[in-house]
Amino acid sequence: VVLLWGSNARETHPIFFHHVLKGIRRGARLYAIDPRHTPTAAWAEGWLPLQVGTDIPLANGVAHVILRDGLENRAFIERATSGFAAYRDHILANYPLDRVARETGVPATTIEAMARDYARADRAMIAWTLGITEHHNAVDNVLSLINLALLTGHVGRWGSGLNPLRGQNNVQGGGDMGALPHKLVGFQDVEDPVARAKFEKLWGAPIPPKAGWHLTDMFRAMERGELTSLYVIGENPAQSEADGKHATHLLEHLEHLVVQDIFLTKTAELADVVLPATASFAEAEGTVTNSERRVQRVRRAVAPPPG
């Protein structure tokens, strides 16, 4: 059983979906959870057209069915989880199926069918994309799906699990290589003195002992006046942030803004200094890591211009 939650993988992750189709032809069941009847939903045994923003009630409604029908994996829960009693009581008290169906717009019978198939499957996976992560409550959306996997024991074993399908090219590779404010290469903690010392020796440079800011934290720091200068590389926050008007206001009031990009973006138009980057995808050596964690070598096509 595969639950594709907020993911139109047929179009956005075609290689991944090719393997899903192979599974369907061997008898696997696909459920598509999406407000739109996408090309992915066309292949699904069940389509759950939830109202936008009701992912958590729907996930908790699925949990309600599993708990009500006694389909939870008790052995796994006792061995590998904590807080189950409080979770069970909250779900059973607050997410009765009639309420969930009313809030989400998904028929109760469809929710029950998916919940039972997922819980009873020998192997089951939940995969999601930006459909649930580009929300103000994105973390809670994902946690509600993780709870389903923990409830049924569909995690930590072959053929089952949780699979976030990344939203942009090489997001996984960037994370692997430490392009995160709180992690070093290989997702080693930047605040771990042993890991930090190892990389300081390799790189021959000191590393700050505290984690940096995520993008959201950067904008909060701008509001507080703690962040006064910004160097933006290949990003367009004036247009990509959820509240573009507010983001633009904060960017305009920085003391110094530098933007490096191959295009004159909306953010670049606000900059004090614009560095016209070259087409690095054609001029760089490196690697790209895809959603199945396959690392591909990238060789440059042309040498960068001198200077």
Features from the language model and the residues they span:
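Cofactor-pocket helix-loop regions in the catalytic cores of large enzyme subunits
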Residues: 1-170, 176-177, 189-307
